[in-house]
């Protein structure tokens, strides 16, 4: 079984909550293979994010943890994913692009659940 990362949309962000449990169903997550995410880590390293709660500002994705991606970072996230060399051949990335666009349109935070 291949390792996967999960990406979803947080419908009601809670400033005090610590997101630490595996809840892909709650956020209607889609899966992206680890091999793809490994190639995106460096280009995403300058993206403003939070690790586990809004009280922990960081940059990039928490590879083995939970990342909260704020609405102001979604354009950068989308640009990196779209510019990935194998974007057109990847069903996973096509689904991720749809999820990012939905979050942008709804001005919502995204959640990344690492491996």
Report each predicted region and the residues it spans.
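Conserved GNAT acetyl-CoA-binding A-motif
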Residues: 111
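Acidic (Asp/Glu-rich) sequence patches and key acidic residues
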Residues: 1-106, 115
């Amino acid at each position: 079984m291949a390792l996967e990362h999960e990406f979803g949309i947080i419908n009601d962000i809670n400033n005090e909550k610590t997101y630490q449990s595996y809840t892909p169903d709650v956020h209607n997550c889609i899966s992206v293979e680890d091999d793809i995410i490994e190639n995106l880590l460096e280009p995403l390293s300058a993206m403003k994010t939070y690790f586990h709660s809004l009280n922990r500002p960081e940059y990039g994705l928490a590879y083995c943890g939970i990342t909260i991606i704020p609405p102001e970072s979604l354009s950068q996230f989308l640009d990196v994913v779209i510019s990935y060399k194998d974007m057109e051949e990847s069903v996973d990335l096509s689904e991720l692009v749809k999820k990012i666009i939905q979050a942008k349109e709804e001005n919502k935070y995204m959640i990344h659940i690492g491996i």
